[in-house]
Amino acid sequence: MLDRADAVRKKTTDDKDLDKLDQCCGEAYFARALAYSELVKLFCKAYESDEDAAGQLGVILSQHYLGDETMRRASLKDSYQFILDDLDRAAELLELEEDFNTDTQGTLYDSIYFNEYTVHALRARVLLYMKRWDEAIKYATKVIDSGYYYLSSCTQAATSSASYYKYMWTNDFS
């Protein structure tokens, strides 16, 4: 899909269509990074260091899905680099306009679309898995300081008489 979308982007001249394509491509890169990050987390050893990760098995990486090439597992280091590269592309394509205004365009907190701050949040998580603490703090701080998102408090009332925590446990009917 990403290969086809890039080909369409090169042939499109209408700015409105280009914006839509950029959003779709950015979301696809983000979704692929998210999927690969979950695969790495579930099926690979923990990332200890760059030297160690270069010798550990990662996941099968593919940027295109055509042909009958032999699929081999990449190193853990290459797997994480693939995820970070996808996040770089996604951040570039999903960058918010400088004049984005939550008063007129709505909040990002309940948005159904990915944006540059969801990319920063995932990057912070991936960097935590890679034990790159300072970089993880940098990207998490970008999300927190953006003012577009807020943390929920377990003492904040979900109803007039219960905290989220109490509400969750007393009203779970599954």
What are these regions (language model features)?
Residues 1-30, 37-174:
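Structured, solvent-exposed acidic/aromatic patches
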